[in-house]
Amino acid sequence: MAFLKKSLFLVLFLGLVSLSIGEEEKREEEEKNEEGANQEENAENKEKRFIGTLIPLALGALTKLFKG
């Protein structure tokens, strides 16, 4: 009976260890995905800021061209 009890505890312990390792890997993968999404958002924001500064400059140049 003691042999079965030890075997059961060993199986439960190994299952718990593998479960915790899987959860850790899943959490790391989610963090990597979030970082990638944040980098894409930053690139989009930079592009929007560039276009936002480019439009007034272009309008200013066009008004000078037509006035001039």
UniProtKB/Swiss-Prot annotation:
- Give the signal peptide as a residue range, or say none if absent: 1-22
Propeptide span(s): 23-47
Instruction: Cite the residue spans of the region called Disordered.
Output: 23-45
Q: What is its main location?
A: secreted
**Keyword terms:** Amidation, Amphibian defense peptide, Antibiotic, Antimicrobial, Cleavage on pair of basic residues, Cytolysis, Hemolysis, Immunity, Innate immunity, Secreted, Signal
Q: Which InterPro entries match?
A: Frog_antimicrobial_propeptide
Q: Is Mitochondrion set as a keyword in this record?
A: no
Secreted in keyword set = yes
Where does it reside? Secreted
| Domain of life the protein comes from | Eukaryota
Q: Which residues carry this modification: Lysine amide?
A: 67
Biased amino acid composition, Acidic residues: 26-42
What's one Pfam family the UniProt record gives for this protein?
A: FSAP_sig_propep
What's the stated role of this polypeptide?
A: Antimicrobial peptide that displays antibacterial and antiprotozoal activity. Exhibits antibacterial activity against the Gram-positive bacteria S.epidermidis ATCC 12228 (MIC=2 uM), E.casseliflavus ATCC 700327 (MIC=16 uM), S.aureus ATCC 25923 (MIC=4 uM) and E.faecalis ATCC 29212 (MIC=8 uM), and the Gram-negative bacteria E.coli ATCC 25922 (MIC=16 uM) and K.pneumoniae ATCC 13883 (MIC=4 uM). Displays antiprotozoal activity against the epimastigote form of T.cruzi (IC(50)=15.9 uM).
Q: Which family does it belong to?
A: Belongs to the frog skin active peptide (FSAP) family.
Query: What name has this protein been given in UniProt?
Result: Figainin 1
List the source organism.
Answer: Boana raniceps
